[in-house]
Amino acid sequence: MIAELLSSALGLLLYLNTLGADFCYDDSRAIKTNQDLLPETPWNHIFFNDFWGTLLTHSGSHKSYRPLCTLSFRLNYLFGGLDPWNYHLVNVLLHSAVTGLFTNLCKALFGSGCWTLIAGLLFASHPIHTEAVSGIVGRADVGSGLFFLLSLLCYMKHCSTRGYSLSSWCWILCAGFWAACSMLWKEQGVTVLAVSAVYDVFVFHKLKMNQIISVVFKEKNVSFFFSVGLLFAWGVILLGARFYWMGNTPPSFSNSDNPAADCEVLLTRTLTFFYLPTKNLWLLFCPDTLSFDWSMDAVPLIKTITDWRNIHTVAFYILLILLAYSSLKGSAIKRDCNGKVFMNGKQNTNGHSCQSDLEHKNAEQNPVIASKLENGVKHHNSHEMQLPSTENIVVLALSLLIVPFVPASNLFFYVGFVIAERVLYIPSMGFCLLVTVGARALYIKAQKNILKNLLFYATAALIVFYGLKTVVRNGDWKNEEMLYRSGIKVNPAKAWGNLGNVLKSQSKIDEAENAYRNALYYRSNMADMLYNLGLLLQENSKFSEALHYYKLAIGSRPTLASGYLNTGIILMNQGRTEEARRTFLKCSEIPDENLKDPNAHKSSVTSCLYNLGKLYHEQGQYEDALIVYKEAIQKMPRQFSPQSLYNMMGEAYMRLNVVSEAEHWYTESLKSKPDHIPAHLTYGKLLTLTGRKNEAERYFLKAIQLDPNKGNCYMHYGQFLLEEGRILEAAEMAKKAAELDSSEFDVVFNAAHMLRQASLNEEAEKFYKLAAGLRQNYPAALMNLGAILHLNGKLEEAEYNYLRALQLKPDDAITQSNLRKLWNIMEKQGLKNSKT
C-alpha cells in the first residue's frame, strides 16, 4: 500500500493550490447557471437533461449525458451553495483516489517494486490533468476515470478467479456495474469494457493475433469467451440505451467548435483528423503549451499533402503500428531478466523488480488459453502467479491510450472540439504505463550501474518537472482573467473575447473594448464577440456604433435573439417605434432548434415579447400588449424571472379597467419575487383605487423599506398621502424623493408641485429651479418656475422665466395670463410703467 499512498498523497498535494480558485470557463454554464443544481428543480431532471441543463432530446443539446457528475454538483450545491472551495476539494480528492487506484493497477503489472511507484507518481504529477482537476467541469473525466479503474480491476479479479463460480461472477457483475457508472460520469467510460477484453485476451491469456481464431471453436474455452461475450453484450446494451436516451440523433456543433468537421474538402478533413491524435500524443509527451480551449484556429487545418505536419502524422502511425505489431506478434519465448524466472511473481535485480516472459516452446504450435484446463476452465495457483511480460503490458498500455480516446477522435462521429486536454485524463494512464515499461526495459538492459542510475534519476527528474509544471499551470486556473491571458498564444480569438467579458465585469471598460476588438482582429465573424462589443458600446451610450455591431452579429448568426433584443431596445429608446416593433416580432419568430443554449435563447425571445408589449402599452394599445404578454408567458423558460412581465400584465388590465385580473397579476408578480418594488407600487395604487387604503399604505411603506434610496418609492407614497389630504407628509415624501433622484425631471417637477400645494413655497422654488435646469427648453417647467417666483415676490426673475416660456410656446394662455398679472403688480410697485 506504500506506493498507492505515496502516489495519492502527491496527487493531493500538487492540487492543493486549486482550493482557493474561482469558477472558470465552462464552470459558469455547468454549475452557476445550471437549473438542475437548484433545490426547486426536481431531482429526476438530471436524468433527462444533458450536462449543461438542456433537455437531452432537444436538437440543440450537446448530447453530453453525465447525470452522476451533475448529481455530484447538485450535492455540492446542497451543502455549500456556490462556494467554489467545496467543488475544488471534491475534484482534488477524486484525483487522489484515481491516482491510488491506478497505482494499484500498476502493482498488478509491475509487482511491488519501484516501477509501480514511478508509474503512480507520473500519473499523479502529469500536467495534462490540470484542466480535468483544476477546472470543476473536469470532474466528469476524473469521476469517470475512478469508475473506469474500478471496473477494470474487478474484471481482472474475475479473470484470476474464473472457475470459482460465485466469486468469479460477483467480480464480473461489479465490473459491469462500475462500467455503467463510468459511462454515466462521462461517455468515454464505456470503453473500459473494450480495455477489459483486451486485458483478458492479450494479457491474461497471452494470446497472439493468429491464435484468436483457432481457439474460438474449442469447447474447453467456453468460459473465457462467455466472459468476453458478456463484455460485448453489456457494451451494446449501454450504448444502445445511451443512443435511445438522447433521441437517436447526433449532436450538432458550430463551425468554430470543430472547423475540420465543417470543411467540405475531403483531403483537408482526412489529413487534419489523422494529425490530431499526433498532436494529442505530443501534449502527453511534452505538456509545455496548454490551453483552456483548442477550438477555432488553435490547430490550423492541414489543407495540402506538403504541409510539414504530415511528417509527424506518418511517423506517429508507423511507430504505433510497429509497437503494436511487436507486442502482439510475438515469439512465445521472450526474456527480460536474463532468463531468470519469478518466484511468487517477483524477482529482485539490484533492488528493482522485473520479470521473465518464459513460456513453453510449444505455445506457438498449440495455442492454449489456460495453464491447466479442466472442462474449459482455467485454474490458478494464487501463490505462483506470474506478472505480465513487457509485451503484455505494452498491449494493455496501448489499449488504455487508444481505446478511451476513440470517442474523441472524430472516427465514428464528429465532436464539439479540436483538442480537449481533459479528454486525455484516462488515456494518460496508458501513456504513463508506456513510459514506465520503456524505462524499465532500458534499465534492465543497461549493463553499467552508472547508466542504471542515470536512467533512474532522469525518470525522477521527469516526475519533478511534471509536478512543477502542474503547480504553475494550476495558478492559471485560479481565476478567469489569468486563465484567458494564458490562452492568448494558443487561441487568441477565444481568449481575447473571454478576457473582454472578465474585464467588463471588473468595470475596466476601455481594456474590455480593446480585448473585444483584438478578438475580432483574429476572427472577425464571431457573433458572440460582435454582440458583446455592441453591448459594451450600448451601455456606454454609443448607440449608433452599438447598432452597427448588433447588425454584424445578427448577420453572422441570424438566430442570435439577444442581438435582436438589444437592437429593438435602442430603436425604441430613439423613438423609432416601427423599426423596433418589426425587430421584436422577427426575434419572437426565431425557433430554438439546433441552438447551443436553447434556454438562453428562450429568455431573449421572452424579453423581446416583453418589450414589444411595453411598446404597445406606451402607445395605448393595451389589448395588443396583453396578447403579446400572454405569448411571452407561454414561451418563457424555467429560469426566466417573470415578475416584470406579470406586473406589466397587471398594468395593462388596470388600463382596461379589468381590476380583478390586474390584481391577480400583481399578486403573481409578488409571488415570483416578493421584493419586486414596481409590483408593490402598482399594487398599492390598485388597493387605493379599490378603497383598501390601509393595505395600500403598507405596500408603499414596504417598497420604501426594500430600497430606502429609491426616490420613486417616496414619490408614489407622497402621491398617496396627497390624495388622503395629508399634505405636509406628502410634501416631505416628495422632497425626499427629489433629493434622492435629483437628476430625474419627473420626480423633481412633481416634488415641486407637492411642496407648493403644502405652501412650502421656498422649498418649491428650489425644486422648480432644479427642474428647469434639467429641461431648459420645456415651457411648462419655465412657466411653473415663473409662477413660484411670482408668488415669492421675485418679480423680475418671474418675468424673465415667463418670457422664456412664451418664446418656446407663444400661444400658452396660462403663461400669458400670469404675465399680465405680474406686470400689473410691477406697475403698482413702480418696477414697470404701462408704456414698457
From Swiss-Prot:
Top-level taxon of origin: Eukaryota
SMART domains associated with the record: TPR (SM00028)
Membrane topology (Cytoplasmic): 99-107, 154-164, 210-220, 334-392, 436-449
Enzyme nomenclature, EC number: 2.4.1.109
GO molecular function, one term: mannosyltransferase activity
The family this protein is said to belong to: Belongs to the TMTC family.
Protein name: Protein O-mannosyl-transferase tmtc2
